[in-house]
């Protein structure tokens, strides 16, 4: 196999047994593809599919005036180039977006007076601006107002029809009440339901119910039509007063015979009256000849329901209406008529209930008009119904494409559920649809068919960014449509253009609201690269049109068999959102309908093939699917007698011959975060859940350290997240410094019109959304040859192109003086000294100078009443200098605000006369460092409003930025120029010249020496013999010139952006942003965790010499409590510890071999022993000796291992690795007490564990208040760190003081230390004077209580006791 540039530097030993035939797909594909489909930016207008934006425009346009004489139609749209790029938008607090220009055609018609036909009078076509559309960055996020946001995908109930029952909870008898619900993509919901009396009702939009037959009548069906649709008929004939029954023997099966059934041929009694008719008798009856009609007694007909109106043949009068039961009188009346055929409903107790017939009896409406009026009263209570209004409302509910849309998905689901073969159809409902649903519902009540499982992933679909945005855009456009229709009337008379008709504000408002405040638009979790990826792959059941936390029951949150390979069963938040917010599995993707699907490899005749097929949850149920770790031989044939499979959502064992598909990979069922946990299969699910969630909270450390025991997913996440910089094209590294990498692209990857240079500007100490540091470091050197896709630079939490969330730490599982009681963690001082867990956090402080009523605020160094020492960090503009080390209270930006004129005392007037005006009319309003925060200034940005002169600091920042851009462009031009001249040189040397500068005579050959002496600019003056060569030279010259002009234009554009004024919010004249870097060392109180849900808080940092140590003197770094393992059942951490120790031991062995300079052959043999003993085989022979030497050097710190989830290293393999490293196979060793030097009395498990430092840092949580702000009403100190609040001395604490009888302490607590306003200020004075007496006054909260009582009308007065 071919290794990439960084992979060959440090190969990860892979224990995986199952061969992977499909690489993990691009992790952000769901987001990227969805938005790309929505915008179709790069697709020419004529070729665009009708999805996304295009679909919205096509569905809303054309807009017609009410008279029909003017029409506005859509032609196409285009997106303009964004004004600012992503980085600039982040800095300036802008939205990264592009203007949307829509080409519209306005046609004005006129009527021909003679024919009445319309003809086009005037057509205008114009590009209309329709607001701005946010663009997605190349990593799947959006920049909105300068912050990165993610639009989370929503998992909602798919449109279609669903059948369910109430699980017997509604009625006390426990009877199952069935219901059906037709859910459209947009429009009114239609429900049908049974009540306890078995009547069928309909509800529209969950309003009051009405009989379902009312809806059928409104569709124009009569009672007879309805009965014929839902029931089979029984036929009776009255011939000369005799009643005969048309016999269908199958219908008698299971019934009790009401009379003797006699054979007409023999006269034998075939079935005796009162006996139940068996299957055998039914069969015998069907074989008897002449038994088509049998005479029956009148009692057999009585009570049956008439199915069709009976009309008197002579008078034409309706004698009996359909749906009437047959009574004795009715039968007598019918007998008076000549011969008659009577149809009744075929009903029975078991599977032919009279539900629709019974419902018709309670239905008060008689015809379509009545029914529509009834529906109108239900939908618009209080409004007087008219025939037209009722008809229009009913038509608009389910049958109008403007108001109702099932969508392609809904139609497909609907047709499949009601048993139709065709899966396409109209987006609106029709009569047949409603009848089909009722038929299925009645069949369910009759015991035929099954209800739907709403938690099945075939009934829930994913709405991603593109679709959510499409819905919002449609909302905006519909609002615009209303206004346009009103204005179109004017277009006819006043000759308006499309631009005049359209106001884009409603669209902009809807889009901004969606991105700014929708529940699904979330502030991106940027703690580390994994948290970014996970956030973009999240699927939420909450949000508009989804569930709410309070209403969601247990079933919705639970893991469903269809989640397999689609949604991770492990990763979900703890707390109220559990199960409602999920993560996509590694290989999952959405299909064209929005259903999640997962890949499987096809199995044919026991043999696994490389053919991959994606199946959705609906399709998957029909196949027998084997697990990924089923044993196969070298030919890919399943060898086991029985294979563990899934079939129809159940787990089963099957014969290999029945297997049709097989999982792609064992990690298929889990999400990205869960697949990063080694030995996941040995952890309890609850702890694995914590492990996956806590990895997302790991803070990037100053020195990244990739895990020695990983899972092989580390590289995928680092690259797909965008944290690591990846080469766009292959080539040679030309320049590398800390902030950028310049690559000279290889010729075969350069197109003629493209520059042959790629410049990668690295992100340096930028602030993430969570205030962690985003910093990239190059991993290549000048001269390195890189290919496309190779890692050029590491980002935050990545090392050598692999994700590195924490540190490999030497851990011992043992108690240590109680300092690791209850999950506490004991740490060695060495961990802190080596900066293993030191993190840098960047805080951003923004200062605004506003225009106030009293005059403009000013950012200045001239601040009243501030000592010169306090200004030591400020430059002449009053802004802190970069590199200043600040402490709490230090001034970051000096700002003065004008204050109103006050009446001055004579002394102040004298002082003002002496010292000038300035001192009194402004007050200090400077931005200072908050309490408890120490840090270094690393960046300052100054934004000035257009028309206001920039200060010196703003100008110097501008010049610095311009110089950086110029340097980039110069390098780009230099490489392109260098490349061009090399091509010219190759073309000129050895060619015969026609003439040239410096006396080059015609007929002479051009030599290298001649070119060396000739200035390069004059090379183009050389004329060659062949015209073709001259043209080629001219082409290179033109390309070079064009490139220079293009780069000049880019520089000019950048200069214009930098020098123009900034667009600040109203009233703001100047904005200064200061970034302060804060270094946080590991300290007691910080939260740490492993990857197995083993979390704890640092309790003590112990000197190295006191820590337990191994026999060779190595002190352990961290001591964990062994009691944290058995009850938590996360044994994965123990296996990781053992394998980590083996990895480290092998690294030490390799280091020793390098130091003793063994032969390369010996080194290769040892590496082969490590890499190829078990698991995946590595192709070490493809590496050169130099590469093997570099690989070995990188393995000194430990051989990185990968144990993929559900396919990892076995206990046996871990033991082998420990032995190979020369360590005890048990993984345990005798430790010695650092303080006494004595050996502990039993061996201790020791090894390397990957530990993370989480974002719950004690510095962010702890604070101490001296004096600070008070609540306005109660005058008690505020609470919480953000308000610089105090510790609440609450009710229970007061009880404690009362119990101890500490009266004076209690009085202090309730008065001067809390809300006795005058008392606390006196207290301050008395402390200053050294007088420690105390007079307690009235607490303010008592006054509040009095006011509260008085407001209730109870007068309370306080009287001084005499």
UniProtKB/Swiss-Prot annotation:
One of its GO terms (molecular function) is DNA-directed RNA polymerase activity. GO terms for biological process: DNA-templated transcription. InterPro entries: DNA-dir_RNA_pol_bsu_ext_1_sf (IPR042107), DNA-dir_RNA_pol_bsu_external_1 (IPR019462), DNA-dir_RNA_pol_su2 (IPR015712), DNA-dir_RNAP_su2_dom (IPR007120), DNA-dir_RNAP_su2_hyb_sf (IPR037033), RNA_pol_bsu_bac (IPR010243), RNA_pol_bsu_CS (IPR007121), RNA_pol_bsu_protrusion (IPR007644). It catalyses: RNA(n) + a ribonucleoside 5'-triphosphate = RNA(n+1) + diphosphate. Its EC number is 2.7.7.6. Keywords: DNA-directed RNA polymerase, Nucleotidyltransferase, Transcription, Transferase. One of its GO terms (cellular component) is DNA-directed RNA polymerase complex. CDD domains: RNA_pol_B_RPB2. Gene3D superfamilies: 2.40.50.100, 2.40.50.150, 3.90.1100.10, 6.10.140.1670, DNA-directed RNA polymerase, beta subunit, external 1 domain, DNA-directed RNA polymerase, subunit 2, domain 6, RNA polymerase alpha subunit dimerisation domain. DNA-dependent RNA polymerase catalyzes the transcription of DNA into RNA using the four ribonucleoside triphosphates as substrates. Belongs to the RNA polymerase beta chain family. This is DNA-directed RNA polymerase subunit beta. It comes from Acidithiobacillus ferrooxidans (strain ATCC 23270 / DSM 14882 / CIP 104768 / NCIMB 8455) (Ferrobacillus ferrooxidans (strain ATCC 23270)). The lineage of its organism: Bacteria, Pseudomonadati, Pseudomonadota, Acidithiobacillia, Acidithiobacillales.
């Amino acid at each position: 196999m071919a290794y990439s540039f960084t992979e060959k530097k440090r190969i990860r030993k892979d224990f995986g047994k199952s061969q992977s035939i499909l690489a993990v797909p691009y992790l952000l594909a769901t987001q990227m593809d969805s938005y790309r489909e929505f915008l179709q930016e790069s697709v020419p207008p004529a070729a665009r599919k009708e999805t996304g934006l295009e679909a919205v425009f096509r569905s809303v346009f054309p807009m017609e005036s009410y008279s029909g004489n003017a029409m506005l139609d859509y032609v196409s749209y285009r997106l303009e180039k964004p004004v600012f790029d992503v980085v600039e938008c982040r800095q300036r607090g802008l939205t990264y977006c592009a203007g949307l220009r829509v080409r519209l055609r306005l046609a004005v018609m006129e009527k021909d007076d003679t024919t009445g036909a319309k003809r086009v009078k005037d057509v205008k076509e114009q590009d209309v601006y329709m607001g701005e559309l946010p663009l997605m960055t190349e990593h799947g996020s959006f920049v909105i107002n300068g912050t990165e946001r993610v639009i989370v995908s929503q998992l909602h109930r798919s449109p279609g029809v669903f059948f369910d029952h109430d699980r017997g909870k509604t009625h006390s008898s426990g009877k199952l009440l069935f219901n059906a619900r037709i859910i459209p993509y947009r429009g009114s919901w239609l429900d049908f339901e049974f009540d306890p009396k078995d009547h069928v009702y309909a509800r529209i939009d969950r309003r009051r119910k009405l009989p379902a037959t009312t809806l059928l009548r409104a569709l124009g069906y009569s009672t007879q039509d309805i009965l014929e649709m839902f029931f089979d008929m029984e036929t009776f004939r009255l011939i000369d007063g005799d009643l005969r029954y048309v016999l269908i023997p199958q219908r008698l099966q299971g019934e009790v015979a009401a009379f003797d059934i006699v054979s007409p041929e023999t006269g034998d009694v075939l079935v005796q009256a009162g006996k139940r008719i068996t299957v055998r008798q039914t069969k015998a009856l069907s074989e008897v000849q002449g038994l088509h009609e049998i005479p029956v007694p009148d009692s057999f007909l009585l009570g049956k329901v008439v199915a069709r109106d009976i009309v008197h043949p002579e008078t034409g009068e309706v004698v009996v209406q359909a749906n009437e039961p047959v009574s004795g009188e009715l039968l007598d009346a019918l007998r008076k008529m000549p011969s008659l055929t009577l149809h009744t409903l075929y009903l029975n107790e078991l599977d032919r209930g009279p539900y629709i017939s019974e419902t018709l009896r309670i239905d008060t409406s008689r015809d379509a008009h009545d029914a529509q009026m009834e529906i109108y009263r239900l939908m618009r209570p209080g409004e007087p119904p008219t025939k037209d209004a009722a008809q229009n409302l009913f038509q608009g509910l389910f049958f109008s494409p403007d108001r109702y849309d099932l969508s392609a998905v809904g139609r497909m689901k609907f047709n499949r559920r009601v048993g139709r073969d065709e899966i396409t159809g109209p987006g609106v409902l029709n009569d047949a649809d409603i009848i089909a649903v009722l038929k299925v519902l009645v069949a369910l009540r009759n015991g035929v068919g099954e209800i739907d499982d709403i938690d099945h992933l075939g009934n829930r679909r994913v709405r991603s960014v593109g679709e959510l945005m499409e819905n919002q855009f449609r909302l905006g456009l519909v609002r615009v449509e209303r206004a346009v229709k009103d204005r179109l009337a004017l277009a006819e008379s006043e000759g308006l253009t499309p631009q005049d008709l359209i106001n884009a504000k409603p669209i902009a408002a809807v889009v901004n609201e969606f991105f700014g405040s929708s529940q699904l638009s979330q502030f991106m979790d940027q703690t580390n690269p994994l948290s970014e990826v996970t956030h973009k792959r999240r699927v939420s059941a909450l949000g508009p049109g989804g569930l709410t936390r309070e209403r969601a029951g247990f079933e919705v949150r639970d893991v469903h068999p269809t989640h397999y390979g689609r949604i991770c069963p492990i990763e979900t938040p703890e707390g109220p959102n559990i199960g409602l917010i999920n993560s996509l599995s590694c290989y999952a993707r959405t299909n064209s309908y929005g259903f999640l699907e997962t890949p499987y490899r096809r199995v044919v005749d026991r043999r696994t093939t490389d053919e991959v097929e994606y199946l959705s949850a609906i399709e998957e149920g029909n196949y027998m699917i084997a697990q990924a770790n089923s044993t196969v031989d070298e030919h890919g044939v399943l060898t086991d007698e029985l294979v563990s499979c899934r079939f129809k959502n159940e787990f089963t064992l099957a014969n290999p011959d029945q297997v049709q598909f097989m999982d792609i990979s064992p990690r298929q069922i889990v999400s990205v975060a869960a697949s990063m946990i080694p030995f996941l299969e040995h952890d309890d699910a609850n702890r694995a859940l914590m492990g996956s969630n806590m990895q997302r909270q790991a803070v990037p450390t100053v020195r990244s350290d990739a895990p020695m025991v990983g899972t092989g997913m580390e590289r995928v996440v680092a690259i797909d997240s965008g944290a690591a910089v990846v080469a766009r094209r292959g080539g040679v590294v030309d320049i590398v410094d800390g902030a950028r990498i310049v690559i000279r692209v290889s010729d075969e990857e350069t197109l003629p019109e493209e520059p042959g240079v790629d410049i990668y500007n690295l992100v340096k100490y930028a602030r993430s959304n969570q205030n962690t540091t985003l910093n990239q470091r190059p991993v290549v050197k000048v001269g390195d040859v890189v290919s496309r896709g190779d890692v050029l630079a590491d980002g935050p939490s990545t090392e050598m192109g692999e994700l590195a969330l924490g540190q490999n730490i030497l851990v011992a599982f043992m108690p240590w003086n109680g300092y690791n009681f209850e999950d506490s963690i004991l740490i060695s001082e060495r961990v802190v000294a080596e900066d293993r867990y030191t993190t840098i956090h960047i805080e951003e402080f923004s200062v605004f100078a506003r225009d106030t009523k009293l005059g403009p605020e000013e950012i200045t160094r001239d601040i009243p009443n501030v000592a010169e020492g306090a200004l030591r960090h400020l430059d002449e503009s009053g802004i802190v200098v970069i590199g200043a080390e600040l402490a709490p209270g230090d001034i970051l930006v000096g700002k003065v605000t004008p204050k109103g004129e006050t009446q001055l005392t004579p002394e102040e007037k004298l002082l003002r006369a002496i010292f000038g005006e300035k001192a009194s009319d402004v007050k200090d309003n400077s931005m200072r460092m908050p309490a408890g925060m120490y840090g270094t200034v690393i960046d300052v940005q100054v934004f000035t409003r257009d028309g206001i002169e920039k200060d010196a600091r703003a100008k110097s920042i501008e010049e610095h930025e311009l110089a950086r851009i110029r340097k980039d462009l110069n390098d780009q031009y230099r490489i392109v120029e260098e490349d061009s001249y090399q091509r010219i040189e190759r073309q000129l040397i050895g060619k015969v010249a026609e003439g040239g500068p410096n006396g080059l005579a015609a007929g002479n050959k051009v030599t290298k020496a001649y070119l060396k002496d000739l200035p390069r600019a004059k090379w183009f003056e050389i004329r060659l013999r062949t015209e073709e060569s001259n043209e080629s030279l001219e082409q290179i010259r033109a390309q070079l010139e064009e490139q220079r002009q293009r780069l000049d234009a880019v520089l000019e554009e950048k200069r214009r952006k930098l020098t123009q004024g900034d667009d600040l919010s109203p009233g703001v004249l100047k904005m200064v942003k200061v970034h302060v870097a804060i270094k946080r060392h590991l300290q007691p109180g910080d939260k740490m965790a492993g990857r197995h849900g083993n979390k704890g808080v640092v309790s003590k940092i112990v000197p190295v010499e006191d820590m337990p140590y191994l026999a060779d003197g190595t002190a352990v770094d961290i001591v964990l409590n062994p009691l944290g393992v058995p009850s938590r059942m996360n044994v994965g951490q123990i296996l990781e510890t053992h394998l980590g120790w083996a990895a480290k031991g092998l690294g030490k062995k390799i280091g020793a071999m390098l130091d003793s300079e063994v032969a390369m052959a010996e080194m290769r043999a040892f590496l082969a022993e490590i890499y190829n003993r078990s698991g995946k085989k590595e192709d070490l022979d493809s590496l050169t000796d130099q590469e093997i030497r570099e690989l070995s050097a990188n393995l000194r710190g430990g051989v990185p291992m990968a144990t993929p989830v559900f396919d990892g290293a076995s206990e046996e393999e871990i033991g082998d690795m420990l032995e190979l490293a020369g360590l005890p196979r048990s993984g345990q060793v005798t430790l010695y007490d650092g303080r006494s030097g004595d050996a502990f009395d039993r061996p201790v498990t020791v090894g390397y564990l990957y530990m993370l430092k989480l974002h719950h840092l004690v510095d962010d949580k702890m604070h101490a208040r001296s004096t600070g702000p008070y609540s306005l009403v109660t005058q008690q100190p505020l609470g919480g760190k953000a308000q610089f609040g105090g510790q609440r001395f609450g009710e229970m604490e007061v009880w404690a003081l009362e119990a101890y009888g500490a009266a004076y302490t209690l009085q202090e607590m309730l008065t001067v230390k809390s809300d006795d306003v005058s008392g606390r200020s006196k207290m301050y004075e008395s402390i200053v004077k050294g007088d420690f007496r105390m007079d307690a006054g009235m607490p303010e909260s008592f006054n509040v209580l009095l006011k509260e009582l008085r407001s209730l009308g109870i007068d309370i007065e306080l009287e001084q006791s005499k």
